[in-house]
């Protein structure tokens, strides 16, 4: 039998020892793995618990980003050439309650959040999933503008004017292409403008000779857009709309270094109550005084509107203040009775104003107690001033609203009179209707303005190739007309009235100057209504001297009449030169 050497006898013992070590290593590894799994599970459980106790903030990404294109051009204003830079673009604004500091807070890292006190975290609003909500409103507006700046001018020595139309729900295409931009679309003076091609020409009456110009589209109109939760609520209303414009103006002044420029507002139609709220807001809330505010076709107190005042019985002023416009319209269309029609309009209107504020106002104030003979006498006098039949006036109880007047002034020839401009007429749509079914002036010129701007903004300003321009939105049903008056803590439930805002702004800044402009043939916002509002502002008598008045033989869009365009340009330019503190 073979004998084993000593080495051979030791090998089995070494193998047994190695096996024991290998088993121990494997067991240890298995145990470590199990422990690691348990630790990881416990860690995940703790992490989940911590996640629920310490929510991670959900930051709200922006809906929009600012953008712009820049071009250059030249305009000749009353014989003087002006080189300008044009910027077409957008700025992002947020609703009231938005705070950039809170926005930065929303974007903090988790580690930074974990260092905050737990009681502070517990107070923050939670979502159903336990995530922390953003402190800020999520709605945003991207507001479109076109700015024209005179080349090589020092900003501190150059006024800047922010212009906007009204609606509510209107873009600013009208002021831009009809009034003060460097290019102007040609439309017929008092009749329907033929279809395209439209003629766009150098604007001899651009306001660039007096001021840099920023045409701004309200949120949701033109190329402006809104987005986010409750977007309509956050931007479609008297107060949120004015706040958006205030935020836009502040952002514009900052972006383009215009804080030390003389500053103006120019608002038309609903742009006038917007201006009243806006100037007061800028001066009180932003410490930003303005040099002046220009109001075109003003309505500050909606109780004075001649659009269906019969729905507000007992309020007689709309009929009284509209009467001079009825008389001017009858004069223009040769509807005044008798052979001796007044040769000049203004003296005739002074006579009508006196009758309106005295005999007519007293008669309406008497209501049902007005004696029949007096009622008959007032009806005959109204016939003299309006051309409407005495029988119709008596049937209307001496009270005729704007739509009824537009339908009946030229009813004998089945023609409807314009609302925005009574110089315009168009075929009556429904001869049996009580009031006008459309506005012949709007129908006559809207296509020219919208078509011309859509062509101009893309070809000349190189903006909007992939976007839709919205000239107007129907917002009357969704617009929040409640307004929080200065000094009040909650919105008023009365009809919108921004006269207190304008008065507050004038008292807060007693150097503020106001220009009121209106057209004699404006049936939407009768000129005498604006006069009445200004003379009833709750301001000291000396501040009344800070308001100047200009009236033209045109309508709501005064500039649609070329002679009136020149006149309003000259008046606005003189107003700016007299208030810009540049010592010219």
Question: Model segments located where?
Answer:
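Alpha/beta-hydrolase fold nucleophile elbow
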Residues: 258-269
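A catalytic-pocket lid/entrance helix-loop region that shapes and gates access to the active site
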Residues: 182-186, 279, 283-384
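Alpha/beta-hydrolase active-site loop
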Residues: 208-211, 218, 235-254
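N-terminal cap/lid subdomain of alpha/beta-hydrolase-fold enzymes
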Residues: 42-57, 98-234, 535
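Short alpha-helix in the alpha/beta-hydrolase fold that links the catalytic acid
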Residues: 512, 526-536
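Catalytic histidine-centered segment of alpha/beta-hydrolase-like enzymes
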Residues: 553-564
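Glycine-rich nucleophile elbow surrounding the catalytic serine of serine-hydrolase chemistry
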Residues: 267-280
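Alpha/beta-hydrolase fold catalytic core
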Residues: 363-524
């Amino acid at each position: 039998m073979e004998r084993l050497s000593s080495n051979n006898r030791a090998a089995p013992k070494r193998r047994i020892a190695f096996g024991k070590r290998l088993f121990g290593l494997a067991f240890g590894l298995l145990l470590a793995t199990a422990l690691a799994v348990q630790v990881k599970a416990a860690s995940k459980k703790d992490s989940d618990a911590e996640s629920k106790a310490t929510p991670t903030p959900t930051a709200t990404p922006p809906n929009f980003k600012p953008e712009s294109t820049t071009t250059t051009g030249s305009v000749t204003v009353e014989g003087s050439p002006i080189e300008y830079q044009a910027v077409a673009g957008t700025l992002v604004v947020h609703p009231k309650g938005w705070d950039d500091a809170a926005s930065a807070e929303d974007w903090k890292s988790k580690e930074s959040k974990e260092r905050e006190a737990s009681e502070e975290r517990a107070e923050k609003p939670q979502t159903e999933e336990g995530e922390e909500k953003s402190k800020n409103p999520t709605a945003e507006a991207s507001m479109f503008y076109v700015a024209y700046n005179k080349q090589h001018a020092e900003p501190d020595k150059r006024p800047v004017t922010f212009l906007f139309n009204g609606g509510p729900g209107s873009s600013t295409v009208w002021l831009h292409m009809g009034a003060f931009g460097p290019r102007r679309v040609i439309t017929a003076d008092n009749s329907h403008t033929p279809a395209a091609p439209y003629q766009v020409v150098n604007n001899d009456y651009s306001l660039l000779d007096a001021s840099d110009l920023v045409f701004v589209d309200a949120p949701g109109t033109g190329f402006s857009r809104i987005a986010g939760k409750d977007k309509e609520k956050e931007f479609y209303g008297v107060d949120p709309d004015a706040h958006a414009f205030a935020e836009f103006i502040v952002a514009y002044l900052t972006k383009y270094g215009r804080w030390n420029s003389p500053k103006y507002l120019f608002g038309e139609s609903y742009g006038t109550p917007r201006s009243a709220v806006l100037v007061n807001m800028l001066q009180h809330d932003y410490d930003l005084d303005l040099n002046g505010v220009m109001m075109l076709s003003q309505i500050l107190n909606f109780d004075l509107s001649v659009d269906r005042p019969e729905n507000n019985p007992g309020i007689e002023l709309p009929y009284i203040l509209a009467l001079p416009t009825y008389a001017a319209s009858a004069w223009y269309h040769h509807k005044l009775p008798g052979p001796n029609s007044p040769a000049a309009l203004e003296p005739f209107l002074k006579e009508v104003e006196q009758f309106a504020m005295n005999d007519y106002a007293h008669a309406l104030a008497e209501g049902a107690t007005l004696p029949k003979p007096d009622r008959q006498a007032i009806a005959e006098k109204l016939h003299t001033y309006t051309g409407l039949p005495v029988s119709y006036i008596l049937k209307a109880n001496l009270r005729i609203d704007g739509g009824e007047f537009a339908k009946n002034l030229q009813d004998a020839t089945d023609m409807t009179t314009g609302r925005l401009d009574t110089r315009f007429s168009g075929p009556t749509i429904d001869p049996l209707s009580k009031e006008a079914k459309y506005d012949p002036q709007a129908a006559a010129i809207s296509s020219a303005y919208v078509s011309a701007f859509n062509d101009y903004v893309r070809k000349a300003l190189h903006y909007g190739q992939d976007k839709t321009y919205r000239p107007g939105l129907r917002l009357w049903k969704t617009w929040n007309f409640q307004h929080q008056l200065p000094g009040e803590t909650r919105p008023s439930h009365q009809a919108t009235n921004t006269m207190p805002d304008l008065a507050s702004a004038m008292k807060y800044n007693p150097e503020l100057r106001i220009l009121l402009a209106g057209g004699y043939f404006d049936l939407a916002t009768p000129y005498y209504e604006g006069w009445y509002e200004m003379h009833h502002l709750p301001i000291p008598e000396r501040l009344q001297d800070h308001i100047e008045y200009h009236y033209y033989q045109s309508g709501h869009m005064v500039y649609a009449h070329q002679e009136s365009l020149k006149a309003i340009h000259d008046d606005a330019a003189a107003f700016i030169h007299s208030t810009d503190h540049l010592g010219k």
